[in-house]
Design a protein with these regions (language model features):
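Short, well-ordered loop/turn sites that connect or cap secondary structure elements
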Residues: 119-120, 139
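Conserved, well-structured core segments that form or line functional sites
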Residues: 109-111, 125, 147
Length: 206
């Protein structure tokens, strides 16, 4: 499966904010954004003129990096969102939030989306009693998420639960039993991603 292998701390520095790509490290003073709050590269400390197109492009790139989605897949999400009823930008975020790997992070069952992707790909999680090993799987209301019996990742997952303070209202989690339920799809106000989705819509509408 193709993925972005560029250094994660540099991805955050390039966007000028924490995207929480490295799990526990992002909550410490070792965070790259905390240590170097300017973009990577020889001219990172300089300021480039921000054209409208550049601002829109940066917002799209930041969103892709936040959700750890490649360009082709991101465009497919946008195309699907644009065909749905409602506001395209909100539809896009709802699709991204409903990815299985993202949901595990929101539930506190993974410290980062990369870790969540590994846990899913290695078959440690089930949905409605069936093993699901596709990180991009779209969860639906009433889905029951549970750890596979006998999973060797239990300790890693329990450690991740210690990093989360609250679980979004559209999800319900039992951190002791390592089970969860999708209550409904998220409202825009419940999506904490640092994204201005209208800029992405404007970019793709050109």
């Amino acid at each position: 499966v193709a993925r972005d292998t560029s250094p994660q701390c540099k991805q955050c520095r390039r966007e000028g904010q924490k995207l929480f790509l490295k799990g526990e490290r992002c909550f410490t003073d070792k965070c790259g954004v905390e240590r170097r709050s300017y973009p990577p590269g020889e001219h990172g400390r300089g300021r480039l003129r921000q054209s409208e197109y550049r601002v829109q492009l940066r917002e799209k790139q930041k969103t892709r990096r936040y959700y750890q989605v490649l360009e082709k897949q991101f465009r497919a999400y946008y195309d699907k969102a644009s065909r749905q009823d409602g506001v395209t930008g909100e539809n896009l975020l709802r699709l991204l939030e409903s990815r299985f790997d993202n949901v595990l992070v929101r539930l506190g069952f993974a410290a980062s989306r990369r870790q969540a992707r590994q846990l899913v790909s290695h078959g440690h999680w089930m949905i409605n009693g069936r093993r699901v090993d596709i990180p991009s799987y779209q969860v639906r209301p009433e889905d029951i998420i549970s750890i596979k019996p006998g999973s060797s990742a239990t300790e890693t997952i329990q450690r991740a639960t210690e990093l989360v303070s609250t679980v979004p209202a559209w999800l319900q989690a039992d951190h002791d039993a390592l089970t969860a339920k999708v209550l409904r799809y998220p409202e825009r106000s419940e999506i904490s991603a640092p994204v201005q989705e209208q800029l992405i819509v404007e970019l793709y509408s050109k």
